[in-house]
Every structure is written in C-alpha cells, then in structure tokens.
Amino acid sequence: MALSRYRECGPVAGLAQARQETSVSTQHYSDGQDIGKGNQDAPMSNDEAARLIGQAIGQVQRVIVGQERMVEQLMVGVLAKGHILLEGVPGVAKTLAVRSFATVLGGSFARVQFTPDLVPSDIVGTRIYSASKETFDIELGPVFMNFVLADEINRAPAKVQSAMLELMAERQVSIAGQTFPAPHPFSVIATQNPVESEGVYPLPEAQRDRFLLKIDVPYPRGNEEFEILRRMSVKAPQPQQVLTPEAVVALQDMASDVFVHNLVAEYVVRLVLATRNPGDFGMSDLANVIQIGCSPRATLGLVAAARALALVHGRDYVLPTDVQAVAVDVMAHRLVLSFDAIADNVSASDVIERVVAMVPPPTPVWNEEQRQTAQHNYPNDLGQYPAPTTPPAQL
C-alpha cells in the first residue's frame, strides 16, 4: 500500500535515517503483516477499537445535534489522555456534551461551577477534624473523578486556577503533606465564555498550555437547530453506556501505540518551529504577529492527538492529514500574539492555518512500479499525497 510508507520505520527512531530513504516498501497494508506496530499485545484489534469508538460517538450524537467536530475532538482528547478547553457562547451544548460523554464512557463525573468566591479546598479537598477520633481526616474534593467538568473556569480567581495546575499536569494533588493520585482515566474538560469580560480572570499562559486541545464550539446550523427543536419537543433522548473505564484505558494505551513515521514526526517538529521562527519558513510577515511561539508541549500534543485521531478512524499509523486536522486545536491556544496582531483582529487560529498551509507535509517517494500499484489500489490516496520529484525537505 502506498500509505504503508508511514508505517515502515521505527517510531521517531532518527530523523536523519528518514531523510536518507529514497524509496517505499511495496508491502501492502492488506497483506496481514504487522509493519511497525507499537504493541503486539494490544487487547483488541483496530477494527474492534474503531467499532467501539464509533458506537460511543454515535450515542453522544443521539443527544448532541450537529457539532460533529466537537464530538470527535472530545473523543480524541480523552483517548490522548489530555485535558480539553471548550470555548463557546452559552447554550451551544458544551456542558451537555461533556455529561453525555461521561455517561457513554462509563466513568464517574463531577461538575464544578467556578465562581469568584471559590477557594482551592472546595475543589481538591481539605482536612476535617473528627471529634470522635480526635484526628484530622482528609476529605477529597469533587475533582477526583474520571471526568471533571470545570464550568466557566475563567470565573475562578488565580489561586483556584493555580490549584488545578498540579492536578492537570501531575495528575495528583497534595493535601496536608499527603499525595492523592487521580483515577484512571482522568480528564479535565473546562468551558469558558469568550464574550464576557466582567467578573472573569483570563487563564494564564501556563494553564492554557496544560490543555491538550482548545475547541471552539460554534452555533448550530439552521437545519440542526430545527432538529434540536424537534427532538426537545418530545422526550429528550438519553445516551447509553458503551464503554467502561477499563476499556477507555485500554483504548488510550492503543492510541499511544499508534505508529508515527519519522517523516511525520519531522513534519510535526517543522510546524512547531515555524511558530517560533516563521521567517525560516517563508513567513517573515508573521514575525510581527507572533510574540511567543508554541512550546514543546505542542510538539508532544500534536503527536498524541494525531495518534488518537488515527485510532478513531481505524488506523494504526498516523498520516500527515491527521496532524493537520488537529493542528489548530492543539497549537492555537499556546500562541501569544503581539499587540499589533490583537489590534488588527488577527486570531491565533488564522496564524496556525497559515503555518499549516505554508509548511509542506511529507510525501512518499515512489518508483514507477509502486506508483502504478498505488494508482490501481488507492487512487484517492494519490490525490492527497502526490509523488514528489525531490526527496522530503530537510530541517
């Protein structure tokens, strides 16, 4: 198969090795050989994983009309073991989507409504004196659940937001000198309203960087709003549980073992480097737009999210289009734009879309026999990945 090009070498084994290669193996994905598979003891096949994931997404879409991209990206974030920030105006089903996901995935769920008078002990827990025992007991907070909905997180003061950092980054909380680990699986899904400015505390860069994905949730389209009205005029549908926490952990392990070819890894690095030194990639005009580029967490996040998306689509290897599909959601919230860019109403999403458009993706290098085989068996893939006349560009 032509796309087996992205399944041959060991994952991120060395960028120099990938650059020296000039041909593609003629082995096809359908020949039954495990080329470059990360985990030979996977608990289920890719087809079975894709079927379960599809059923889970289908159950959520029984409740959520439209918003297909948000639903898919929520699944990607959970499978990538990441935290997710949903941004949208009130009433676009952010909270309902998270609650439905928790039901479908079978995990415990807690919703924390962030307010200006919230204190850290309200969310992580505190010591409580027991008169009968004459000792202090630890009362854990609501964040010790599989899925935590931090509703309107930007309404909480800085000390509460900072209390979330250890939990999100280390997946543990320290109370009175004791460390309490978060359960498995564990994801914080936060929401915020982009239009409100009174009584809000904007998330600092350090906390935004902890979120794997930031998903913009738009208004539903006209036909979708009509369907919402139709469904809610009768008994609202309820999602059914499809997975268990143990199954979610197994799927997360499968996602982390999805194969990443060296050429795709090199492409990820180039995308991130382009946000730090845009002039080196033919985008000198962005030098006055970007104040601070993406951190190395963006590099790791792109690979993790692309792996999860590949698993959602039933593949055990990552394509460049997987990276492109998650680039805006992974990278945009990590950029710090200049004051000039903000004054000109330039958004971080626009900048990332420009970077993705300007940085060329890797393409397989075929000889004539391989080209004819691919043209016969995978004509659609040829349309996306035309054979280049020169080897992939070096860093």
Regions found by a protein language model. Give the residues of each.
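Walker B catalytic acidic pair
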Residues: 88, 151-152, 163
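C-terminal engagement/docking regions of AAA+ P-loop ATPases
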Residues: 25-32, 38-43, 280-395
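AAA+/P-loop NTPase substrate/partner-engagement loops
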Residues: 104-132
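Walker A/P-loop
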Residues: 78-115
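Conserved alpha-helical scaffold flanking the Walker A/P-loop in AAA+ ATPase domains
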Residues: 73-76, 129-149
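Pre-Walker A (pre-P-loop) alpha-helix and adjacent loop at the N terminus of AAA/AAA+ ATPase modules
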Residues: 48-84, 89
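Canonical AAA+ ATPase core
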Residues: 130-135, 152, 156-160, 168-258, ...
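Conserved C-terminal "switch" segment of AAA+ ATPases
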Residues: 46, 50, 63-64, 200, ...
